[in-house]
From Swiss-Prot:
Residues 1-13 have a biased composition (Polar residues). This is Uncharacterized ORF3 protein. Residues 1-86 are annotated as: Disordered. It comes from Torque teno virus (isolate Japanese macaque/Japan/Mf-TTV9/2000). Residues 37-60 have a biased composition (Basic residues).
Amino acid sequence: MMMNQLNSLQKLGQETRYPLAEPSKSVAVPLSITSSKSKRRRRHSRSRERKTRKKTRRKQLSSSSSKSSSDKENCSSSSSGGSGDW
């Protein structure tokens, strides 16, 4: 009678121990840590991508703006010459 109860209790303990222990080990602690780290990494990588995109945009803008600014300079020089004649 006592042996059967002990065996059943041990079986119950094993049954309850393993499912409770495994998720707490696998799910609760490492996943939260890894997810936060991966989120941080993703944020950094995204910001880096944005920075590189901005840099490429700046290059494109600077090249286009240099063309437009040279046009503006030509216009302004001609207009300033006109004002000088005035």
